A protein has these predicted regions:
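Short Asp/Glu-rich motifs
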Residues: 130, 161, 270
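Nucleotide 5′-phosphate-binding alpha/beta core
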Residues: 1-109, 116-131, 135-148, 155, ...
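Active-site glycine/GP-rich loop and adjacent strand/helix microenvironment
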Residues: 1-36, 44, 51, 174-370
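Short secondary-structure capping/turn micro-motifs that flank functional sites
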Residues: 69-70, 154-155, 215, 266-267
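Hydrophobic transmembrane signal anchors and adjacent membrane-proximal interface regions, especially
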Residues: 66-70, 164-170, 362-367
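Alpha-helix boundary/capping detector
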Residues: 86, 136-137, 160, 164, ...
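Mobile, glycine- and charge-enriched loop segments
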Residues: 120, 147-188
């Protein structure tokens, strides 16, 4: 089940949507019920990724020598050089999988909040762990079959719709990104009531999306006297930085727990922040996460370093020891294999302001597949 197939059919084929949801629920339950398997899964996937890169990427053949096995993959990964956007741009096809053809159609753009965006080919293989980790988070928040999810993001709404006070559009599928996508671009004192009217009609169990947009909607609703009568199970903040105070405010307003999620388009890290604090736990199911100093050496607990990731999702361009550009305080590792980020320090630039002082969220302009 690769990304190309899902992008094409999840929006229009209800049978595919249903099967995908059931598939994700099955594996999410399996991992949640057996967390003792996470570290072994991570080791197996790391071994598979290194072996694949050795066989299919010219760039890695000179660095990965000899047989890659589960008993030596950790030693191998620590010996490899760090990868960054400049190396990728310079190497191009050498670092791409040899399965990527000249007429490859599925390409993605990375975020540019900590640097210039990167354009790379997308190729999934095996279990879609992105969906599994998303489902694990929703189930942690109490997800049940039939619960509605809506998102707040930077989608652009047609002029015709906005003239009729419609500031949302239908999503690709309810899970994981929302049945309806509410745009953060048009929120103001005049439009907020229409957002709330549609939210009440939709009756979501979960809201996910940009923290700043969700915060702004809450504040505008309070300022205009709108009564909050949604019955939410949880709010899921992603794509932007936010503070614990902002998370607490959203939780207090919606009267539900608020979780944070940290990741990248490179599909190499999926980290969860619980409601009570700012600590992130990086899933060993999704990838292998390090925090390194300027020399590429792993920092000690309590020290600051750059988040470096090796993903288990993206094979078109294997992101192995990839420098994210984000800084974090390293907090060690849980017994389940989760890398702990005590505090995430990256992503300072999430928005700009137009001449009228209106926030324009950068993420909506960057994260777009072709």
């Amino acid at each position: 089940m690769n990304r190309t197939y899902l992008q094409k059919y999840l929006k229009t084929n209800s049978s595919i949507q249903w099967l995908y949801m059931k598939y994700m629920q099955y594996y999410a339950k399996k991992f949640l019920n057996h967390p003792e398997t996470w570290k072994q899964w991570q080791l197996a996937k790391l071994t598979a990724m290194l072996s694949y890169a050795q066989r299919h990427c010219t760039y890695y053949r000179k660095y990965i020598v000899g047989e890659v096995r589960m008993d030596n993959s950790m030693e191998i990964i620590k010996s490899l050089p760090l990868l960054d956007k400049n190396i990728i741009r310079h190497q191009e096809k050498n670092v791409y999988s040899d399965e990527i053809t000249d007429n490859w159609k599925v390409w993605l753009n990375t975020g540019g909040s900590t640097g210039e965006p990167l354009h790379f080919p997308a190729l999934y293989k095996g279990l879609p762990v992105e969906g599994v980790c998303q489902m694990m988070l929703y189930m942690k928040m109490g997800y049940q079959w039939g619960d509605i999810i809506v998102s707040f993001d930077g989608c652009r709404i047609k002029d015709e719709d906005r003239s009729r006070n419609i500031y949302w559009q239908m999503g690709n599928a309810n899970f994981p990104f929302g049945k309806k996508n509410f745009s953060t671009l048009y929120l103001d004192n005049n439009s907020v009531k229409y957002y709330w009217e549609e939210l009440k009609r939709t009756k979501p169990a979960f809201i996910r999306g940009y923290p700043s947009g969700i915060m702004e909607m809450c504040k505008l609703a309070m300022n205009t006297g709108i009564v909050m009568d949604l019955k939410l199970k949880g709010v899921y903040l992603t794509s932007e930085s936010f503070t614990q105070d902002e998370k607490n405010f959203i939780s207090s307003y919606f009267k539900c727990p608020v979780y944070g999620q940290y990741g990248h388009t490179e599909s190499s890290i999926f980290a969860i922040q619980n409601p009570a604090d700012e600590v992130y736990y990086c899933s060993p199911i999704y990838g292998y996460t390090e925090v390194v100093d300027q020399k590429g050496q792993h920092v000690n607990i309590g020290e600051q370093g750059e988040v470096v990731v090796t993903g288990f999702v993206e094979y078109g361009l294997p992101f192995i020891r990839y420098k994210t550009g984000d800084l974090a305080i390293y907090g060690g590792e849980t017994e389940l294999g989760e890398t702990i980020l005590t505090k995430l320090l990256g992503r300072e630039v999430d928005c700009i302001y137009n001449k009228g002082g209106k926030k324009i969220y950068l993420v909506g302009f960057i994260f777009r597949s072709e």
